[in-house]
């Protein structure tokens, strides 16, 4: 059965909370990209999203792992607040204020995921020296101990129940990643960096992509899985998949992706 994919803006202002069990998602800062002046100048910054374990409390991030807990290094790093992207260094105070508004101090963050290596997405890594880092495909523990992990397009990284990191190449090359959070009040939320710049970007994302073929595939995978997408430079949006009647010819979207209608 074929189907149409429709997207529509998710109402609400930042910080935007999507409660869930065992993880909630909080969009702390909404990214933007706006032309400025003449020529091709753009003022931009990336979205910042917090993933909070339901059982987290300020003391729990610093507890010692129990002997019976068989966890990977990544799963242990995800025991506390997880930050997905950090915006640019010019957003330092806004980021600290947004975290404080959720009762989270920089030292509480146990894992920072950088979706890709652009300055408007990982410009504040220095605020979190005590956190493990997963930037693109590089995973390191505090102090610079790098560990292998095996992430691939057909092999997501499991951080916890319903919490995964996906390889979603394209925009920044072959090493972009996205974070999937299942079990929220709105279904599956995916924080995707610049795989989607914003809702309704079909006519513009290709010009910013290092590998449009790979990114097109990543976008299709995300649209086939997510109920809510947090893009890199715009407001979160819902993804609504609708079954369609049998057709003599397949529906086509404007850019050849999963057929999409924007609400």
UniProtKB/Swiss-Prot annotation:
The keyword Metal-binding belongs to this UniProt entry's keyword annotation: yes
InterPro entries, sorted: MBLAC1 (IPR039344), Metallo-B-lactamas (IPR001279), RibonucZ/Hydroxyglut_hydro (IPR036866)
GO molecular function: metal ion binding; RNA endonuclease activity
Assigned EC number: 3.1.27.-
Chain sites annotated for binding Zn(2+) 2: 120-121, 194, 233
Tree of life domain: Eukaryota
GO terms, biological process: histone mRNA metabolic process; positive regulation of G1/S transition of mitotic cell cycle
Quaternary structure and interacting proteins, as annotated: Homodimer.
Protein family: Belongs to the metallo-beta-lactamase superfamily. Glyoxalase II family.
Stated role: Endoribonuclease that catalyzes the hydrolysis of histone-coding pre-mRNA 3'-end. Involved in histone pre-mRNA processing during the S-phase of the cell cycle, which is required for entering/progressing through S-phase. Cleaves histone pre-mRNA at a major and a minor cleavage site after the 5'-ACCCA-3' and the 5'-ACCCACA-3' sequence, respectively, and located downstream of the stem-loop. May require the presence of the HDE element located at the histone pre-RNA 3'-end to avoid non-specific cleavage.
Protein name as catalogued: Metallo-beta-lactamase domain-containing protein 1
Name of the coding gene: MBLAC1
């Amino acid at each position: 059965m074929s189907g149409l994919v429709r997207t529509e803006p998710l109402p609400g202002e930042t910080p935007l909370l999507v409660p869930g069990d065992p993880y909630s998602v909080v969009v702390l800062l909404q990214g933007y990209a706006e032309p400025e002046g003449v020529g091709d100048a753009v003022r931009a910054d990336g979205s910042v999203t917090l993933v909070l374990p339901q059982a987290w409390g300020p003391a729990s991030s610093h507890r010692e792992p129990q002997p019976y807990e068989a966890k990977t290094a990544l799963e242990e790093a995800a025991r506390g607040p997880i930050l997905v992207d950090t915006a640019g260094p010019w957003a330092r105070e806004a980021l600290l204020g947004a975290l404080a508004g959720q009762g989270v101090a920089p030292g509480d963050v146990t894992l920072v995921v950088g979706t890709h290596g652009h300055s408007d997405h990982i410009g504040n890594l220095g605020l979190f020296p005590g956190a493990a880092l997963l930037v693109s495909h590089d995973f390191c523990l505090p102090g610079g101990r790098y560990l292998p992990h095996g992430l691939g397009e057909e092999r997501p990284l499991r951080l916890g129940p319903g919490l995964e990191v996906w390889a979603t190449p394209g925009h920044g090359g072959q090493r972009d990643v996205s974070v999937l959070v299942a079990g929220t009040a709105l279904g599956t939320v995916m924080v995707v960096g610049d795989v989607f710049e914003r809702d309704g970007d079909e006519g513009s994302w290709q010009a910013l992509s290092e590998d449009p073929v790979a990114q097109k595939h990543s976008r299709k995978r995300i649209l086939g899985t997510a109920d809510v997408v947090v893009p890199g430079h715009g407001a979160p949006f819902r993804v609504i998949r609708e079954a369609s009647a049998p057709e003599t010819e397949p529906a086509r979207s404007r850019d050849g992706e999963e057929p999409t209608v924007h609400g």
